[in-house]
C-alpha cells in the first residue's frame, strides 16, 4: 500500500510568457490530491531537471506554447538520462503538431496534450502511469 502522494513538477520552459494553462493544470493536479511544484516562467531544461531532482518528483509536466518543444524537450530528456532519472514520467502540453508529438514520444515523452485537453484525462493518465512504475 503506497500512501505517498504523487509529486509533479509543472514547468514553463523557454521564452513563452503565458502561464495560465500551466496554472490551471497545477490546480487540477493539486485538487486531485497530488503534490505540485510549479517552477514559474522561463525555465531552462537544466533548471527544470535540477528542480525535479531536488524535489524528488515522479512526473514532469512541461507546458510549451511557444513552438520550441523540438529544442527544449530533447534536452530535458537527455538531462534526465544523464542524471539517471529516466524513470520520471514526462508529459508535454501545448501547441504541438501531430508529427512532432510522435517524435517527442519516440524520445520518451509519455503523453502529449493539446490545448483543451480534459483535465480529468490528464489526472487519470498520471495516476495510472505512476502506479505502473511505483
Protein language model annotation of sequence segments:
Residues 9-11:
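Short hydrophobic segments within beta-strands
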Residues 22-127, 132:
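Cofactor-cradling patches in redox/metallo enzymes
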Residues 1-6:
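Non-catalytic signal-transmission and effector/linker regions of two-component phosphorelay proteins
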Residues 14:
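A glycine- and charged-residue-rich anion-binding loop/surface
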Amino acid at each position: 500500500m503506497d500512501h505517498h502522494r504523487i509529486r509533479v513538477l509543472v514547468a514553463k520552459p523557454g521564452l513563452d510568457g503565458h502561464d495560465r494553462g500551466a496554472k490551471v493544470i497545477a490546480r487540477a493536479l493539486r485538487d486531485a490530491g497530488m503534490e505540485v511544484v510549479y517552477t514559474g516562467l522561463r525555465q531552462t531544461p537544466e533548471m527544470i531537471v535540477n528542480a525535479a531532482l531536488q524535489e524528488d518528483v515522479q512526473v514532469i509536466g512541461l507546458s510549451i506554447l511557444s513552438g520550441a518543444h523540438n529544442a527544449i524537450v530533447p534536452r530535458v530528456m537527455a538531462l534526465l538520462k544523464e542524471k539517471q532519472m529516466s524513470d520520471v514520467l514526462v508529459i508535454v502540453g501545448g501547441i504541438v503538431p501531430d508529427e512532432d508529438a510522435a517524435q517527442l514520444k519516440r524520445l520518451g515523452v509519455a503523453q502529449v496534450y493539446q490545448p483543451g485537453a480534459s483535465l480529468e484525462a490528464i489526472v487519470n493518465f498520471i495516476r495510472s502511469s505512476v502506479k505502473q512504475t511505483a
